[in-house]
Regions:
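N-terminal Rossmann NAD(P)H-binding glycine-rich loop of SDR-like oxidoreductase domains
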Residues: 1-22
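SDR active-site strand-loop-helix element
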Residues: 5, 29, 54-58, 98-104, ...
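Adenosine-cofactor binding site in Rossmann-like domains, unifying the SAM/SAH pocket
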Residues: 20, 24-45, 59
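Conserved cofactor-binding/catalytic machinery of classical short-chain dehydrogenase/reductase
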Residues: 38, 82-86, 97, 136, ...
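NAD(P)H-binding glycine-rich loop region in Rossmannoid oxidoreductase-like domains
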Residues: 39-81, 86, 92
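Catalytic helix-loop patch of NAD(P)-dependent Rossmann-fold dehydrogenases
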Residues: 71-78, 82, 105-172
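NAD(P)-dependent short-chain dehydrogenase/reductase
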Residues: 112-113, 144-212
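Mid/C-terminal beta-alpha module of Rossmann-like enzyme folds, strongest
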Residues: 213-269, 273, 298, 304-307
Length: 307
């Protein structure tokens, strides 16, 4: 029996649908239903359900975007850092394997030395490396409470990110989720609805690919640890717009901010993460996702507008 925390959220609902298609027995629990101080109650829930695995999709992202986290810092911290810590402790006590949906939004800009940011790179868009959004700070802290630490390495371009002992579960980094279903949380929908766009290059995660890759970690019993679960490659905002227009999803006149300074002055309350992640670790354990342009093409070919 898989316990799915955050089963009513954007990503959690899709995990549940995936489990149904796969015939995986699961029980959903809302992350909000837990008093984060009542660890005994959480432990008893997992015991009573005879859980064989825990997937944590619960977290606090802010609606409509991360700016909202700046106004609700207590709940943001609880959902993104306190809850993962409780899950680690309880699952450790019960010997239950777990997976936690983290975020690639703990990095920004280009990686020193080139290439995409790797799992063993310390976050550079965090409370320890400001400025950052409060959301990103709490997501980086969420990895810290799961046992990861920044370590200075002689001769390295950037500090490393290492577990304090041995990794105990899966940490899956999601990055700018999208799929074929029009939704306020879908990146492709956001691009179509924003009045003005910021030009940036990013890694993205197609949600069906993301969920299948996460579950494959359990199925293949790959080593515990952090995995960047994004579609290989990267894409710019203008490339996404071109694909949206190409597939006829929305042919409006798209406008862009002149630069990030104008974006921050007119449309944002907190800095944004724009980055590219390296996916070679996931591929190295035999888990492959479609290239990002292919995944975007497919999602827009099968686009389902909101009713």
């Amino acid at each position: 029996m898989v316990i799915l925390l955050g089963s009513m959220g954007y990503v959690g609902q899709l995990f549940g649908q995936y489990f149904d298609r796969k015939g995986v027995a699961w029980t959903g629990i809302s992350g909000r239903s837990f008093d984060l101080g009542a660890k005994d109650a959480i432990l008893q829930t997992l015991k009573d359900s005879k859980a064989t695995a825990v997937v944590n999709c619960a977290g606090y992202t802010g609606k409509p975007n991360v700016d909202a986290c700046e106004l609700d810092k207590g709940n943001c911290l609880d959902g993104n850092a306190v809850l993962p810590s409780a899950i680690r402790e309880i699952c450790g006590d019960l010997g239950i394997p777990w997976g936690h949906v983290s975020s690639g939004c703990i990095f920004a800009l280009e990686r020193p030395g080139g290439g995409g940011w790797r799992e063993d790179d310390a976050p550079n868009f965090s409370f320890r490396h400001p400025p950052c959004s409060f959301y990103s700070g709490t997501k980086a802290l969420g990895e810290e409470v799961l046992g990861y630490r920044e370590v200075e390495t002689s001769g390295a371009d950037w500090p490393s990110w290492q577990h304090e002992s041995e990794a105990e579960g899966y940490v899956w980094r999601l990055r700018i989720p999208f799929d074929q279903n029009d939704s306020p949380r879908n990146y492709l929908s956001k691009v179509q609805r924003y009045e003005n766009l910021l030009q940036a290059r990013n890694s993205l995660s197609q949600l069906e690919d993301f969920i299948a890759a996460c579950w494959a970690c359990f199925e293949k019993q790959v080593p515990f640890g952090i995995y960047n679960v994004t579609n290989p490659g990267s894409v710019t905002t203008s490339e996404v717009v071109d694909l949206i227009v190409k597939h006829g999803a929305n042919n409006k006149d798209y406008k862009f901010f002149d630069n990030e300074e104008e974006f921050m002055a007119k449309a944002a309350k907190t800095p944004r993460s724009n980055c590219v992640l390296d996916t070679s670790k996931l591929e190295g354990v035999g888990i492959n996702m479609r290239p990002v342009h292919e995944a975007l093409d497919w999602s827009l070919q099968n686009w389902r507008p909101e009713a």
